[in-house]
């Protein structure tokens, strides 16, 4: 709790209300909104999707009841692009987004446009990615696992027929095991629960949100609060039974809104 409050207070002191964030039906954006409201930040909110999208419906319901405003953008309604202009869009995506955008460089121009749009009036962009630190992201039981079994459960789930003869599956996953050992500074082949929890921020989050955050910093200052060490290290020790089904996460949002109700539904 204190780590979150202090972090967002620093944001308030540096950027006041010139801060933008998405709001959706997920835990993470709603938790950021709750913390921001607690420290006095009036977020400039946006949501992407169609009118029938659950994210849009939930976001609009939240802002209505909280007396806030939100910028709703349906990316699918962008005008159809002619062949002549499409070259420029692909080229812009290639250079602006380092060809690392989530949906690829072949889009309708909405990716770059919305990144610019959401930061026109703000100095800082916040992304709730990483909020899974408060949930059982790996969906594994509360026990030790060998690194091999961990990889098998979460990563070795592909159809390798798409690979050429140059791909050596055995070698690839042996290297993956060694990489996990290096990340966790261990020589053991078995991981305890805390080590498994660490792999979310130190492995998965690093190569997911790290890329997106780097791209966002081309358009404005951008932060991913739940990826910060002072956030995720404290989350490692939350009992796994509370992380299941979003029990802790839901109560944490309520706690930020109505301080004092944390754990009320966690018996």
Positions of PLM-derived features:
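Core structural elements
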Residues: 197-211
């Amino acid at each position: 709790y204190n780590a979150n409050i202090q972090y967002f207070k620093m944001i308030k002191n540096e950027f006041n209300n010139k801060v933008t964030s998405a709001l959706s039906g997920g835990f993470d954006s709603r938790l950021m909104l709750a913390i921001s409201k607690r420290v006095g930040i009036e977020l400039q909110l946006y949501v992407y999707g169609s009118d029938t999208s659950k994210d849009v419906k939930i976001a609009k319901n939240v802002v209505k009841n909280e007396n806030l405003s939100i910028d709703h953008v349906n990316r699918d309604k962008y005008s159809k692009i002619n062949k002549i202009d499409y070259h420029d869009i692909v080229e812009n995506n290639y250079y602006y987004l380092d060809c690392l955008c989530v949906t690829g460089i072949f889009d309708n121009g909405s990716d770059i446009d919305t990144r610019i749009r959401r930061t026109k009036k703000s100095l800082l962009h916040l992304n709730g990615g990483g909020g899974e630190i408060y949930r059982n992201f790996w969906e594994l039981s509360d026990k030790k696992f060998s690194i091999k079994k961990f990889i098998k459960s979460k990563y070795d789930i592909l159809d390798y027929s798409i690979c050429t003869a140059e791909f050596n599956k055995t070698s690839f996953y042996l290297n993956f095991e060694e990489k996990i050992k290096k990340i966790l500074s261990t020589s053991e082949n078995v991981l305890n629960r805390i080590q498994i929890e660490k792999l979310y921020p130190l492995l998965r989050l690093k190569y997911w949100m790290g890329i997106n955050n780097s791209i966002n910093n081309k358009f404005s200052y951008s932060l991913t609060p739940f990826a910060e060490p002072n956030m995720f290290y404290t989350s490692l020790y939350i009992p796994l039974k509370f992380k299941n089904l979003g029990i802790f996460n839901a109560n944490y949002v309520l706690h930020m809104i109505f301080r004092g109700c944390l754990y009320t539904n966690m018996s």
